[in-house]
């Protein structure tokens, strides 16, 4: 285990907090190392088998939840509402696709966010930017915005509560498509939280104990970076966001690092191209990965490439643009011989107005805006996004 940690720590790690009290970081990491794993190896194996079915075209995935989770929303009522929305969207997706649907939440650990800037100006004051509840506070006060390592422990405890409320108490023993707890996932970002939760079972298998299904984002997918190094070592299925600027060579090198044995369902690529770029940029990438022999699941993130600023000054996204990208995504993937496996959405069960239906609705954005970071789809908007899959053309599979 020490050798693994050394290999990861010698790599460059981007988007990491600058903790204000190093002694508190030491204590927090010790707590995380001594705490129980949030997930079990047997569940990882079940999830990998389930995702292999998706990679074979036998099931679909709906992955959704908050952009940034609120650690104060770890009580049963909050978790129940989020799980109910996931169930509703999965049911809708099942009707649309006529296939079983794997339910995955952006939940029980989505407490940190990468940011473009280190600071922001609020009025006349320059403050550290908010990086998620696991790192610092939201209030526009310097004391709240300092990076506080004690929040790592709060994040673990909140995730533990959420896991229990989701129903992860008893061994699974079967492939979980319906009638069982939703799988958990989050962006594997803060290594001071993730590394102490790396575990090794009796058979010597290394796994990440913080979540069932970790992913890395556009800002941390560097081939020689610490995040890729860690994902390459763990038993968990893994995922990576893919934007319009990645080259075929970069993507193939990334796939080789994360999926060297070409195992179906081991690696999922989450395309976040933007509605106006996906048709041109995605097909060559899908074809290159297919020809390299990787049994990849492709998911569409139709939100992050389509963020704009509303008249009120808040970030927003238009549902029309989101559905346009979903339609273009599926056509791009299936025409290139890939497996279009489902959707990755930022959603909330609350009746918010963070996303607009179209350009005419931009003036309504902000009247009910509660997101801690990026705009989310409310339930009706999320259903519209899921239904957009039905408008896509049927697959035309291409053999290797």
Swiss-Prot record:
Top EC class of this enzyme: transferase
One Pfam family from the record: DAHP_synth_2
E.C. code: 2.5.1.54
Transferase among keywords: yes
Pathway participation: Antibiotic biosynthesis; phenazine biosynthesis
InterPro entries according to UniProt: Aldolase_TIM, DAHP_synth_2
Entry GO MF terms: 3-deoxy-7-phosphoheptulonate synthase activity
Catalytic activity: D-erythrose 4-phosphate + phosphoenolpyruvate + H2O = 7-phospho-2-dehydro-3-deoxy-D-arabino-heptonate + phosphate
One record GO biological process: aromatic amino acid family biosynthetic process
Alphabetical UniProt keywords: Antibiotic biosynthesis, Transferase, Virulence
Entry's family note: Belongs to the class-II DAHP synthase family.
Protein name as catalogued: Probable phospho-2-dehydro-3-deoxyheptonate aldolase
Chain's gene name: phzC
């Amino acid at each position: 285990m020490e050798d693994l940690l050394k290999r990861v720590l010698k790599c460059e790690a981007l988007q990491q907090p600058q903790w204000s009290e190093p002694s508190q970081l030491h204590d927090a990491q010790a707590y995380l190392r001594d705490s129980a794993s949030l997930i079990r190896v047997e569940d990882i194996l079940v999830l990998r088998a389930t995702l292999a079915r998706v990679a074979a075209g036998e099931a679909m995935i709906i992955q959704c939840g908050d952009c940034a989770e609120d650690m104060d929303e770890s009580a049963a009522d909050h978790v129940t509402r989020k799980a109910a929305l996931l169930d509703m969207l999965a049911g809708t997706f099942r009707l649309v696709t006529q296939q079983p649907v794997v339910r995955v939440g952006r939940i029980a650990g989505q407490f940190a966010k990468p940011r473009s800037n280190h600071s922001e100006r609020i009025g006349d004051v320059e403050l550290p930017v908010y990086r998620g509840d696991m790192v610092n506070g939201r209030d526009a006060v310097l004391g709240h915005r300092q990076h506080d390592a004690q929040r790592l422990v709060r994040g673990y405890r909140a995730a533990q509560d959420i896991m229990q409320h989701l129903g992860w108490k008893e061994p699974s023993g079967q492939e979980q498509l319906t009638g069982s707890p939703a799988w958990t996932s989050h962006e594997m970002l803060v290594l001071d939280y993730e590394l102490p939760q790396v575990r090794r079972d009796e058979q010597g298998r290394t796994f990440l104990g913080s979540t069932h299904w970790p992913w890395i984002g556009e800002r941390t997918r560097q081939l020689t970076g610490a995040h890729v190094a860690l994902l390459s070592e763990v038993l968990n299925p893994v995922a990576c966001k893919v934007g319009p600027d990645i080259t075929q060579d970069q993507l193939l090198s990334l796939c080789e690092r994360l999926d060297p044995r070409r195992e179906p369902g081991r690696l999922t690529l989450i395309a976040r191209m933007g509605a106006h770029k996906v048709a041109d940029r995605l097909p060559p990438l899908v074809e290159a990965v297919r020809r390299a022999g990787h049994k990849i699941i492709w998911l569409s993130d139709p939100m992050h490439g389509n963020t704009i600023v509303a008249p009120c000054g808040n970030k927003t996204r238009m549902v029309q643009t989101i559905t346009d990208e979903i339609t273009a995504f599926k056509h791009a993937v299936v025409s290139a011989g890939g497996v279009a496996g489902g959707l990755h959405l930022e959603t909330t069960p609350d009746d918010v107005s963070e996303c607009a239906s179209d350009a005419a609705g931009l003036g309504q954005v902000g009247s009910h805006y509660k997101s801690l970071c990026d705009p989310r789809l409310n339930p009706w908007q999320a259903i519209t996004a899921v239904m957009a899959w039905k408008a896509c053309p049927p697959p035309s599979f291409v053999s290797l």
